[in-house]
Amino acid sequence: MKIISGNANNKLAQEIAEHCFANLVPANISTFADGETSVEFLENVRGQDVFIVQPTCTPVNDSLMELMVMTDAARRSSADRITAVIPYFGYARQDRKSASRTPITAKLVANLIVTAGADRILTMDLHAGQIQGFFDIPVDDLTSRVVFSKDIKRTIGIIDDPDVEQVGTVFVSPDAGGVVRARKFADMFHGDIAIVDKRRPEAGKSEVMNLIGDVKGKH
């Protein structure tokens, strides 16, 4: 197994490598004067199971291009299998046509990553589950619920004792699209959910119209 890090989150890649008792593959990732991305692996990856850790976060376009160039480099270096580890999947919010003459960019990005040579995708809490269907390769959409549940439990002081009366807990979804995620958290803590009803008058702006649900006096 070989783990390779892009520039988007080298610290995360290092922690993953340490957890797996592995070393990061050294790589030269540079930018030419005209802005082009250049990649060279400094270790043999032939026949290896390669994991490329590169969330496509800000700057999204640069991170995405770097991921694709690294994936292509691994493929042309004869890696046996290439897994793109993308904790944050950029363009995920563009998963459908928002108007008559707009693209479905999440699908385009999926096509680009597959064409670059990825055999498998590892991501976390996709904005919309249907994005998994945009790929023609396996996609593992991991959840952060187990990690966050420990902090939530500690923060609100939940006690594992059915005889102790506790203040109600409510999980608020910021929009209709997050209801399923909020419901899963609520089920874990036997809580309720609330939904923020909002509208987007223009790109990048939202207005809260209503709060659906009861949050008074609750965590």
Where are these regions (language model features)?
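PRPP-associated nucleotide enzymes
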Residues: M1-H219
